[in-house]
C-alpha cells in the first residue's frame, strides 16, 4: 500500500475524516470496552464482548480492505474505502447485536453523510477545463501540442479520487507544448460520444484519460475490450506515468521546444 504523503495527511484533517473515523471504529471499540454494557442489552450473566461470529466478520472486513488497498489510486482513496466498508460492516454488526443501537448507528451514518460530505480536491493544478466542442476545436487547431485529457463526471466517486493524481501529473509534466485538460461528459454527453467515452455507470469507463498527439488519440485508459467492457485500471500516479509514457513524451516535447527556441534565436 502507498505511504501517505504530508499533503495527503493534511487533507485528512477535516470533519469528514474525523466523524467517519469515529463511525468506522465505533463497533470494535464499544464492543471491546466497558461501554459495551451501557450500549447493548445483555441477558443474565452473559459477558458483553466481541463473540466468535463478530470476530470472523471483522477479519473478513480486514481481508476486503487489504484487497481494496491494491486497487486504490492513492492513500486518500484507500481511506475512503476503509470508511465505506467499515460502516457497512458496522451497520450489520450493530443490528445483529441489538436492534436499537443498530438503528441509532444507521441514523448517525446518514447524518454524517449529509452534514459532512467528502471534501472536493482544491489543490494546485495546471489543467484547462473545456466546455462543449472546445476540446475538439483545440485539438484540430493546435496540432503541435500534446494534450492529456481526463473525461469525467461530477457524480462519479472514481473521478473524484483520480483528481489529485491528475492534478499532480499536470504540475510535473506541463509544458507550453504539452498540456492537461478536462471535459465533463456528464454535461456534454455528445462530446463523450465523439471521443468514444461511455458515461453510463455500468460501463466502468469513468474516468477515462486519453493522450492526443497531432489531434490523434495515441493512448487511452481504461481500454475497452471487444464486448465493450472497460478493462480495470488503477489510476495511481506511477501507473499513469508508465501507461501514457509521460516521461518520454515530456522529454520529446521539451527537446522540440528547445530546438524551436534556438532556431528563432
UniProtKB/Swiss-Prot annotation:
A motif (Di-lysine motif) lies at residues 262-265. The chain crosses the membrane at residues 97-117. It comes from the Eukaryota. Residues 126-230 form the Thioredoxin domain. The keyword Transmembrane helix applies. It is a single-pass type I membrane protein. It holds the Pfam family Thioredoxin. Residues 118-265 are cytoplasmic. This is Thioredoxin-related transmembrane protein 2 homolog. It comes from Caenorhabditis elegans.
Amino acid at each position: 500500500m502507498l505511504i501517505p504523503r504530508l499533503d495527503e495527511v493534511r487533507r485528512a484533517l477535516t470533519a469528514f475524516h474525523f466523524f467517519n473515523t469515529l463511525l468506522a471504529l465505533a463497533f470494535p471499540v464499544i464492543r471491546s470496552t466497558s461501554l459495551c454494557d451501557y450500549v447493548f442489552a445483555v441477558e443474565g450473566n452473559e459477558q458483553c464482548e466481541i463473540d466468535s461470529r463478530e470476530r470472523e466478520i471483522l477479519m473478513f472486513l480486514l481481508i476486503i480492505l487489504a484487497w481494496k488497498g491494491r486497487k486504490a489510486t492513492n492513500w486518500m482513496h484507500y481511506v475512503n474505502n476503509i470508511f465505506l466498508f467499515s460502516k457497512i460492516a458496522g451497520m450489520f454488526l450493530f443490528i445483529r447485536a441489538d436492534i436499537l443501537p443498530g438503528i441509532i448507528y444507521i441514523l448517525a451514518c446518514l447524518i454524517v453523510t449529509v452534514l459532512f460530505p467528502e471534501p472536493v480536491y482544491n489543490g494546485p493544478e495546471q489543467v484547462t477545463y473545456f466546455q462543449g466542442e472546445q476540446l475538439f476545436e483545440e485539438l484540430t487547431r493546435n496540432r503541435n501540442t500534446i494534450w492529456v485529457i481526463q473525461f469525467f463526471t461530477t457524480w462519479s466517486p472514481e473521478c473524484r479520487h483520480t483528481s489529485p493524481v491528475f492534478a499532480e501529473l499536470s504540475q510535473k509534466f506541463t509544458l507550453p507544448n504539452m498540456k492537461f485538460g478536462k471535459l465533463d461528459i456528464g454535461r456534454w454527453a455528445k462530446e463523450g460520444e465523439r471521443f468514444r467515452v461511455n458515461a453510463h455507470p455500468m460501463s466502468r469507463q469513468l474516468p477515462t484519460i486519453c493522450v492526443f498527439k497531432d489531434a490523434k488519440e495515441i493512448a487511452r485508459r481504461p481500454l475497452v475490450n471487444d464486448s465493450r467492457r472497460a478493462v480495470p485500471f488503477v489510476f495511481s500516479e506511477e501507473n499513469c506515468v508508465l501507461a501514457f509514457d509521460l516521461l518520454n513524451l515530456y522529454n520529446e516535447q521539451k527537446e522540440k521546444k528547445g530546438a524551436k527556441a534556438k532556431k528563432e534565436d
